[in-house]
């Protein structure tokens, strides 16, 4: 120990009591005789020792008394990091003088304090000091194994750095913040959860294992700036971003289906397939399901019972460029017509895919494969290891292509039965602490402590150098009180979007992997791994899953979670959305991971030429719109997949909009110099007498107005010959719509004039409504015109298309508005757009 580094730690003497609750044993911290005290410790690779003759104790031997404070938090808290960007991880230990005892401190606060900086880092209170992690080495915070920390009297130390002490209990507000951890939409604020451990008392740790996916931004900036940063600050490939958003939206649909039915019939499967290429992202709908789930065969397992580091880091095949997402909406999804436009049809499905689907037991994430059908046989001999990378390139043709497939009717029921039957054989699960053999696959029933965003690993060596592999990290725990990270590779990384804090999940065919860089043992997925999300622990009934896992094991896990992680009961339940009840919202009220409708005004558009992703076998550029609802409150809207085709229609010079306005005049041009104008001053009698002049006789096929010869015989429409039928039409009109002080002239075609007049055809104006009545349809039409143009008439909802002709300076030379539809019932459609 004499050759170890010396660590000098200085403590200040605070004048006022700290804003935390401590026991009486630590009262000496509040006031000391001397302003400073000094203690010298010796540091080795594994522990700290007091350099004191009276107490040559290892800090590992310190006892931590029972903590007092919030019963539902048990030492967990979120801290607000100050302006200093501090990285402190699990290997930090809080030291005290030889005259003081370490007391567990539980923090009380009624609310979440304002976040001055979102650069929150993990800070742990441990009783042991493991060697430093790779991240800390990079940060050089503890580069020379020497810490000299001197604090002023008014800055108490919590994690060795300046952390605010305004902490809060884990209630509904905390749950809302924790949702930021597991949502793909929260990319501006990256709070990582502060971790704390008390030994030997119970401990609870909530970690955010995000691997630096998103950049941090202050939250005191405007929402419009945050929306722009959300799109521009992503540090993942556009392919991964595209697939992440599509996956998240489909998981929202699956969650509402699970909550609605809780039945084994799967009508909304989300199937994902990846193939080994960094660019992946194509969306299609298959006509029928031709996929078989056969990932548990012995032939496949015989070739996979080895460490997977080579397979994980030899990920790509240059010939495969796309990843497709397959979705076939069921009847429920068909009601939501807008979402159907995101997907197209495809007859054939590749045999290898990763699927996310709804089954009777929960949301199942699985991988289809044909490894067992391949003639390639691999062994662990040294000769085969030389050519293993080339063999993997041939075998792993489909390791990174993503699909979402929705099966209908009988095929869905049959597929779900196959899923359940496969899980019936997974009765034997292993505790995390018993997963110690690298040559064996394990099935683990665990609880999710912290999901993570998907990040990407750059391949820097080998033939696939320069490519990227998706990776997500999920921290789990089970009744053995062993916490472990689970690495989800390639398409399995997108499973992270299906799990949330407190979910009970079943992981199959995971293996042990030792990270040689940081000396940590983790679980990681294989090509045959599956994930079954049983749901939140508070809503699980063990008897419902007796056919999937051991009921006794599940009960033990639930009992452990209930006793050791009781704070999860305070998390608000996730409310699944209904497909037929998606609401129109204002942008300022947007919530993460919620599907919404919105009426927006396009302010500007941007095509990001460098942000390219694969869609339908082609490279597609990322299109970003700047939109607003209120004046000068801008938000960013990204058009993904087929939505990018809307871009030409959303340019500033033309577009479609709904307006609510009152019709003040209808002008029917008869000749170049003659027109009939109907307005609020027109009497009912004058309108009725004008009806013969606002109709014309035209070709029944094309609507062209037919001229007459000297004998008053209509000439033929030569373009429609031999078709010679005639029909009476309303003349096109020029409508003037007003909204307060603004007015606009709108062109109205003949068909829409007929729709405005309750679909009364122009060729029946002289007909009586009933034989015994003298009231004709012409009288009804005149009364409709009179009511529509009256001063007291109610506003109507008009769907108009605008077309502007601009000069080189974007000055409008010509503007033209055409009526596309007419909605007299403004309550039903609820349009709020203005002129």
Swiss-Prot record:
Keywords for this protein: Chromosome, DNA damage, DNA repair, Nucleus
Subcellular location(s) of the protein: Nucleus; Chromosome
Gene Ontology biological process terms from the UniProt entry: DNA repair; negative regulation of double-strand break repair via homologous recombination; positive regulation of double-strand break repair via nonhomologous end joining; positive regulation of isotype switching; regulation of double-strand break repair via homologous recombination; somatic diversification of immunoglobulins involved in immune response; telomere maintenance in response to DNA damage
Top-rank taxon, per record: Eukaryota
Record region (Mediates interaction with SHLD1): 652-822
Interaction with ASTE1, as annotated region: 1-568
Gene Ontology annotations for the cellular component aspect, listed alphabetically: actin cytoskeleton; chromatin; chromosome; nucleoplasm; nucleus; site of double-strand break
Keyword Iron: no
Ranges where the record places region Sufficient for interaction with SHLD3 and MAD2L2: 1-60
Listed InterPro entries: FAM35A (IPR029715), SHLD2_C (IPR031589), SHLD2_OB1 (IPR049507), SHLD2_OB2 (IPR053944)
Subunit structure as annotated in this protein's UniProt entry: Component of the shieldin complex, consisting of SHLD1, SHLD2, SHLD3 and MAD2L2/REV7. Within the complex, SHLD2 forms a scaffold which interacts with a SHLD3-MAD2L2 subcomplex via its N-terminus, and with SHLD1 via its C-terminus. Interacts with TP53BP1. Interacts with RIF1. Interacts with ASTE1.
Family label: Belongs to the SHLD2 family.
Misc. comment: In BRCA1-deficient cells, function of the shieldin complex is necessary for sensitivity to camptothecin and the PARP inhibitor olaparib.
Biological function: Component of the shieldin complex, which plays an important role in repair of DNA double-stranded breaks (DSBs). During G1 and S phase of the cell cycle, the complex functions downstream of TP53BP1 to promote non-homologous end joining (NHEJ) and suppress DNA end resection. Mediates various NHEJ-dependent processes including immunoglobulin class-switch recombination, and fusion of unprotected telomeres.
Name of the protein in its database record: Shieldin complex subunit 2
Organism the protein comes from: Homo sapiens (Human)
Lineage: Eukaryota, Metazoa, Chordata, Craniata, Vertebrata
Gene: SHLD2
